[in-house]
């Protein structure tokens, strides 16, 4: 080929440049497998992250898919082959299970991001109907005869496990750490649960849309979202005297992301949750931000609560899971009426 001909040289150069640009452009697809009530948060966050990534790599095409359900159920789906690049679940035990049973990420995954890989927090509060007709003020009111309590199944829902442990922690504090009395209290509470929903969003739908129950035990973000969406004073938030600090964690599913070629983008996606923009998105979707400046800005949006922690009351999620939610554990004993 005679490249001394300027027009021919430019034509060849154009082909080379076009090929190089085409090679550089990537069609990226991420799957975020998340727990039940994070739909709105991640729809909002995904839009911001796509814009952020396009600013760095303008030729890339990025599509983020979401999967939602009860946290325990979602973890099992990933272990069984759902090819998540990222998991954003309700509690650390569920990601531990993916690491231990699925061998899809390292056991020390929590050390890879700040705050034990938990970019935002939440807690457990109550939602009651307008005027609070049953006079619900604290956990004790949930075990009274004739009070229908809506909470999902702890076997499938991460939020339900937080609900259960918050109630247990309250009973321990009230009764001088008497485990037998705590078990009796939680058993009474679950006797007042008329519907066995598998996830937090299903429980909210049962209470808010189907009109079943006198009180919903729920994630704080789910309650605040329900208040916003109803907009007419149809419901009220009740903050109990004691609740629990819920720390939903996030992780890259290494083996899947490596196979998909999405490791760098998946890592950047989770890191973006910790930026001021990511924290602001969490706050406006009613999750408590970790970043102090953003938390201070939104402090008025969240009730002040006395919060227990999973470590101080239950010595971490591994022990809580085995004692309370494993097959034959305390929750199963409560359900069957055994000791």
Model-derived regions, located:
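Short beta-strand->loop
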Residues: 33-35, 128-130, 148-175, 190-193, ...
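Extracellular/periplasmic juxtamembrane helices and adjacent flexible linkers that interface
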Residues: 257-339
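Ligand-binding pocket segment of bilobal, Venus flytrap-like solute-binding proteins
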Residues: 174-241
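Bacterial N-terminal signal peptides that target proteins for export
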Residues: 1-11
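N-terminal segment of the mature folded domain
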Residues: 26-157, 306, 334-335
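Short helix-loop capping/hinge motifs at secondary-structure junctions, enriched
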Residues: 131-137, 156, 169-177, 256-264
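Sec-exported extracytoplasmic/periplasmic mature domains
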Residues: 46-55, 79-83, 92, 99-103, ...
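Bacterial N-terminal signal peptides
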Residues: 10-22
């Amino acid at each position: 080929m005679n490249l001394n001909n300027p027009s021919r040289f430019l034509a060849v150069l154009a082909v080379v440049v076009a090929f190089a640009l085409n090679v550089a452009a990537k069609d990226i697809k991420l799957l975020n497998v998340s727990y039940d009530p994070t739909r709105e948060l991640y729809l909002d966050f995904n839009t911001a992250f796509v814009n952020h990534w396009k600013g760095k790599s303008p030729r890339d095409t990025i599509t983020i898919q979401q999967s939602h359900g009860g946290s325990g159920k979602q973890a099992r789906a990933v272990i069984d082959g759902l090819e998540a690049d990222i998991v954003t679940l309700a509690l650390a035990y569920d990601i531990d299970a993916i690491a231990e049973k699925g061998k899809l990420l390292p056991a020390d995954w929590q050390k890879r991001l700040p705050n034990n890989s938990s970019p935002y927090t939440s807690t457990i509060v109550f939602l009651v109907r307008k005027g609070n007709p049953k006079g619900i003020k604290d956990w004790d009111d949930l075990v009274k005869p004739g009070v229908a309590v809506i909470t999902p199944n702890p076997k499938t829902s991460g939020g339900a496990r937080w609900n259960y442990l918050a109630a247990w922690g309250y009973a321990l504090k009230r009764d001088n750490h008497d485990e037998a009395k705590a078990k009796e209290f939680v058993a009474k509470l679950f006797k007042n649960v008329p519907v066995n929903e598998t996830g937090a969003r299903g429980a909210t739908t049962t209470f808010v849309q189907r009109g079943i129950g006198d009180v919903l035990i729920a994630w704080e973000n789910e309650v605040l979202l329900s208040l916003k969406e109803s907009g007419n004073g149809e419901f009220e938030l009740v903050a109990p005297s004691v609740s629990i600090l819920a720390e939903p964690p996030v992780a890259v599913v290494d083996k899947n992301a490596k196979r998909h070629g999405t490791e760098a983008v998946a890592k950047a996606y989770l890191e973006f949750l910790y930026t001021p923009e990511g924290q602001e998105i969490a706050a406006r979707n009613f999750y408590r931000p970790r970043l102090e400046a953003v938390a201070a800005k939104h402090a008025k949006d969240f009730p002040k609560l006395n919060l227990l922690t999973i470590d101080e009351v239950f010595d971490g999620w591994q022990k809580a899971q085995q004692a309370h939610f494993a097959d034959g554990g305390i929750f199963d004993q409560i359900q069957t009426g055994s000791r």
